[in-house]
Amino acid sequence: MEETTVRECTTIEEFDGCVQLQREAFGLPDLELSPRRHLIVSRQAGGWTLGAFAGDRMVGFVHHLAAVHGNEISGYSHVMAVAKDYQNKGVGARLKWAQRQRALGEGRAFIKWTWDPMRARNAHFNLNRLGATVDTYAENFYGIDYDDPALTERTGLPSDRLFATWNLNSPRVVALAAGASAPVQAKPVMTVAIPAEWTALVKQDASRAREQQARVREEFKKAFAQQLICAGFERGDEQSRYLLFEPQKGT
């Protein structure tokens, strides 16, 4: 497989490639995709899009928005997509680390984004490989989800999301960026379990899936009400679990 390089997308053709990659990776209707005009306009407003290229072919991208949270100038990672034949080959990680480098060069210390808390693969990537942390749970963030591309029927599930905070200069993130092991964390004070195969559960028993989602929502809300921080994830064959800790300086 051809080696990939990362560079900024600047042309209309490259932005069209980002839209096509979303179709391929997510299988969502066009209404749910970030369109070319959005990518172009956000670039004029201080955002940017980094593409991963294998030769002349774009095989992944990450779209970054300039953001302000209170008095904090940060970044917001709106969408990332990787071509199916390049998934699980390190392209996503390469894009995220390139995003970190670019953001640091702009003087930004944090990047934020969201993911579905029921997705074990995303949780492992964001928490364990990138070193992001979470202290916020958003219920039904995008409205009811009727178009999960992994399913054969419309799911009608709330689009709950965890809000990631990527502290670009934390000891954990700095170590991971250098390819080293992250500093050992204290024992978690609470865990939140999720099904290991969420898509399969929704297909087999949508009612049970809805119950599991509601349980996870309430457990996270309880944890965050106690000021706990989610900063780790353990994957298992039957179930996986989020690890929550007492807050520590610099995480």
Protein language model features and the residues they cover:
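Charged, low-complexity intrinsically disordered regulatory/assembly segments
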Residues: 187-251
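Conserved acetyl-CoA pyrophosphate-binding loop and the N-cap/start of the following alpha-helix
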Residues: 86, 90-98
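A short, well-structured alpha-helix characteristic of acyl/acetyltransferase catalytic modules
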Residues: 12-24, 173-190
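Conserved GNAT acetyl-CoA-binding A-motif
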Residues: 103-116
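Amphipathic alpha-helical blocks and their helix-capping loop/short-beta junctions
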Residues: 139-187
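Conserved catalytic-core motifs of GNAT/GCN5-like acyltransferases
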Residues: 114, 124, 128-151, 232-235
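A conserved beta-turn-beta hairpin within the catalytic core of GNAT-like acetyltransferases
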Residues: 67-77, 87, 109, 186-191
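A conserved beta-strand-loop-helix scaffold within acyl/acetyltransferase catalytic domains
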Residues: 4-84, 231-236, 248
